Amino acid sequence: MPASFADTTFTDPSRIRNFCIIAHIDHGKSTLADRMLQLTGVVEERAMRAQYLDRMDIERERGITIKAQNVRLPWRVDDTDYVMHLIDTPGHVDFTYEVSRALEACEGAILLVDAAQGIEAQTLANLYLALDKDLTIIPVLNKIDLPAADPDRYAAELAHIVGCEPSDVLRVSGKTGVGVPELLDEVIRQVPPPVGDADAPARAMIFDSVYDTYRGVVTYVRVVDGKLTPREKIKMMSTGATHELLEIGIVSPEPKPTDGLGVGEVGYLITGVKDVRQSKVGDTVTAARNGAAEPLTGYREPRPMVYSGLYPVDGSDYPDLRDALEKLQLNDAALSYTPETSVALGFGFRCGFLGLLHMEITRERLQREFDLDLISTAPNVVYRVEMEDGTEHVVTNPSYWPEGKVRKVFEPVVKCTIISPSEFIGSIMELCQSRRGELGGMDYLSETRVELRYTLPMAEIIFDFFDSLKSRTRGYASLDYEESGEQESQLVKVDILLQGEAVDAFSAIVHKDAAQAYGHKMTTKLRELIPRQQFEVPIQAAIGSKIIARENIRAIRKDVLAKCYGGDISRKRKLLEKQKEGKKRMKTIGRVDVPQEAFVAALSSDAQADKPKDKK
């Protein structure tokens, strides 16, 4: 039985191959992984289900991979047994750091491209990551069974980018299984075996960790040097914390405990820790006694790029929201949150996310898995504000914008790569310029496809940039971005005043040129949403003390003359004067209650409504 060879660990490194699959969303990565699981016999036919490795409901429903997964596969070539570790990576731009860690655990990568669509921006971004790590790239075209597939054209495009011959590009179909056995043979032939010192102190890199309700944190590692055995004390090198190894094993594709892991092997550890933040992705694990002195390179803390406030619609759900966020954080070390209060929305949390998809998925999981109704404020980025008196403030929430004289404001910028059919160049450039973008360069990948490189302020992207890009290019363009420092900008805070009082939930930090438009848009929208009162209510948009836009909600007037039939004019005048006095008094002491629905509509319709060009 060849399967038993893969079940024993401490395999000779020359017979191990570690590889991952790089692909854009929807190019069939998880389906190809399914075929590999079936071909190698790791998963029985009856236990098989589509997208076997995507465990979360949300992953299966949206068809995206969020958490990296790994599987140990047995395979025979030329009468020799080999062990392959397939590490399944997320394809989305928000999870680039996870991808880079997963790539660190491999020696080779399958570059998978849809034969009907060609290469996309995120595939390119991940390909460059893989080339940085000196991985062996095996170019593969998937979905060749599709009627729309054009393998010859895209094989030439792929060969041009990777630098090989079009005939070297393998052609497979993850759906029907055509070409997959040949692909596995190629992996064994082309991917170099792992290199490591078996006698050195143990060093293993964490490339993922997940929280299991019953067993605590399960940490996935790739052993680089030495070996790890159960009941041994281990140390995390970034935090210095020590834990006892309760269980160690391989994933095939269900976890199987073993008596340890050797050089080049990929598997899991369980230490009984309850918090994912203690086993950080990218950290180095070593033995507590006689451990390694130098950690493996490349670890960095995940940094939130986008902030948004989350508030329960019903205030009594606040403790539930806190528990839910705590549980999600067990599984997602990149999510950060701090409690905050808003005069308008009550108690809630300010949450930090890696990007827009991360934010959307977190929100959806809170609503679905924990059954919460949430309002989320418009997303914003982190600003650095220098004041005239030399103090410096870091602003994650428009309400905390410092009062007083501002000397400089810095905002984060990102480098964007957009790949699109060449007929859309004009409208893409127009879109990027309207978002304060600077063109960095442009290359033709083939006659019909072009790559544009832009530097854009992060704040311009997080709103609806992606949607606008898709609608201008009929859905053909793809986008990838990476952070690249900060730049000084002319930014101002726009407050929305009701009856002269600022409403914190509607404040926004926008570029000076877009402030007028934002103010006008919000005041008009609120005029429609806030119910009429007994007295006139002014809605104003202001920068500091300067009003830049105003709308009025007209008063509702009761007909006080209804009871006077005929009668003297002075009687009527008396009643009207009395009403006028009352309105005046009301106006000075009256409060405007903004209904919850108006908040939800004003904050959310920003994202869906008339897609303003100038919105931050």
From Swiss-Prot:
InterPro entries: EF-4, EFG_III/V, EFG_V-like, EFTu-like_2, G_TR_CS, LepA_C_sf, LepA_CTD, LepA_IV. It comes from the Bacteria. One of its GO terms (cellular component) is plasma membrane. It is a peripheral membrane protein. It is found in: Cell membrane. It is an enzyme of class 3 (hydrolase). GO terms for biological process: positive regulation of translation. GTP binds at D26, H27, G28, K29, S30, T31, N142, K143, I144, D145. The keyword Nucleotide-binding applies. Its EC number is 3.6.5.n1. Residues 14-195 form the tr-type G domain. It catalyses: GTP + H2O = GDP + phosphate + H(+). Pfam families: EFG_C (PF00679), GTP_EFTU (PF00009), GTP_EFTU_D2 (PF03144), LepA_C (PF06421). Keywords: Cell membrane, GTP-binding, Hydrolase, Membrane, Nucleotide-binding, Protein biosynthesis. GO terms for molecular function: GTP binding; GTPase activity; ribosome binding; translation elongation factor activity. Required for accurate and efficient protein synthesis under certain stress conditions. May act as a fidelity factor of the translation reaction, by catalyzing a one-codon backward translocation of tRNAs on improperly translocated ribosomes. Back-translocation proceeds from a post-translocation (POST) complex to a pre-translocation (PRE) complex, thus giving elongation factor G a second chance to translocate the tRNAs correctly. Binds to ribosomes in a GTP-dependent manner. PANTHER family: TRANSLATION FACTOR GUF1 HOMOLOG, CHLOROPLASTIC (PTHR43512:SF4), TRANSLATION FACTOR GUF1-RELATED (PTHR43512). Belongs to the TRAFAC class translation factor GTPase superfamily. Classic translation factor GTPase family. LepA subfamily. This is Elongation factor 4. It comes from Nocardia farcinica (strain IFM 10152). The lineage of its organism: Bacteria, Bacillati, Actinomycetota, Actinomycetes, Mycobacteriales. The gene is lepA.
